[in-house]
Design a protein with these regions (language model features):
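Canonical tetratricopeptide repeat
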Residues: 5, 37-40, 44, 51, ...
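Structural marker of alpha-solenoid helical repeat scaffolds
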Residues: 29, 33, 67-68, 101, ...
Length: 288
């Protein structure tokens, strides 16, 4: 467990090779037994391999999981990597298999849509969203996921109706997605109201807070964005620490606080010396 936690910390700090080593050591300690914890470590190892640039290694790790239990998540994640390698045929095949193993999982349909959309296959991606909407909603989470799908399809009225059902059933996370809908509708006051409800719940993770901060950046509310980014960095687990720190520096820069932006960038460069874009940005800040 110590190696697993160390590996997670390494991912958060951008030390991906060290993370892979830590996860491998954790697996070596399992002495042949494979349970839920070992599979969890394998997923982390594959993520670290991909982030380190070892794409083929990540594919091998996901394949090992698939060989063991044909897990739909492993098929989906391997499919995403195939798309990153420009092998859409293998990617689509994995997506199809993932759904055959788990065809009532809304998040799987959403993930497939987002991947296809990212690689210029938006129309094909929408077909998956349409398939998901044919499922029958049974739980508050189902209504929330349907709300997300309607939002992606631009049907904001239907999104609000679905999300309201989830909120009525006390699903706190639905407030976050409701905030996103109003953000897209251009109603910043309503958006902020729902984001605040979610923030006050204490359930927001670092990815949610980063997205809320980015939404404020898009509206030119840089001070509010900085607050969201700071809240994210104060959490116990921050897997996307590098991205949040970088976004916060940009927010300081856009707000006109170049001194703080420069100071934060100096700290960032010590933590992430291999970021060439940041090095160029630092040169710019030195001229301000």
């Amino acid at each position: 467990d110590a190696y697993r936690q160390y590996g997670i910390n390494c991912i958060e700090n951008g030390s991906y090779d060290d993370a892979v080593d830590a996860f491998q050591k954790a697996l070596d300690q399992s002495v042949g037994s494979v349970g839920a914890e070992e599979l969890d470590i394998c997923y982390y190892k594959a993520k670290a391999q991909y982030l380190s640039g070892d794409v083929d290694g990540a594919i091998d790790t996901y394949t090992a999981i698939i060989d063991y239990n044909k897990d739909s998540d492993a098929y989906y994640l391997r499919g995403c990597i195939y798309f990153a390698k420009n092998d859409s045929d293998k990617g689509l095949k994995d997506f199809k298999t993932a759904l055959s193993e788990n065809d009532d999982n809304y998040e799987l349909y959403l993930g497939i849509y987002e991947t296809l959309s990212k690689y210029g296959m938006n129309d094909q991606g929408k077909e998956y969203l349409d398939k998901a909407l044919k499922l029958k909603a049974k739980t508050a989470d189902d209504y929330m996921q349907r709300g997300r799908i309607y939002t992606m399809l631009g049907d904001y009225d239907s999104a609000i109706k679905s999300l309201q059902k989830a909120i009525d059933e006390k699903l706190v996370k639905a407030n976050y997605y409701m905030g996103e809908v109003y953000q897209k509708k251009g109603d910043n006051d309503s958006s902020q109201k729902y984001f605040k409800k979610y923030l006050d719940s204490g359930e927001a993770d670092s990815y949610d807070l980063m997205n809320m901060g980015q939404a404020q950046m898009d509206n030119g509310n840089y001070d509010t964005a900085i607050t969201y980014f700071q809240n994210a960095l104060e959490l116990e687990s921050v897997p996307n620490k590098q991205q949040i720190t970088k976004a916060m520096i940009i927010a300081y820069e856009y707000s006109g606080d170049f001194a703080t932006a420069k100071s934060k960038m100096e700290e960032y460069m010590k933590d992430y010396p291999d970021d060439e874009d940041a090095a160029r940005e630092y040169q710019f800040l030195e001229t301000r």
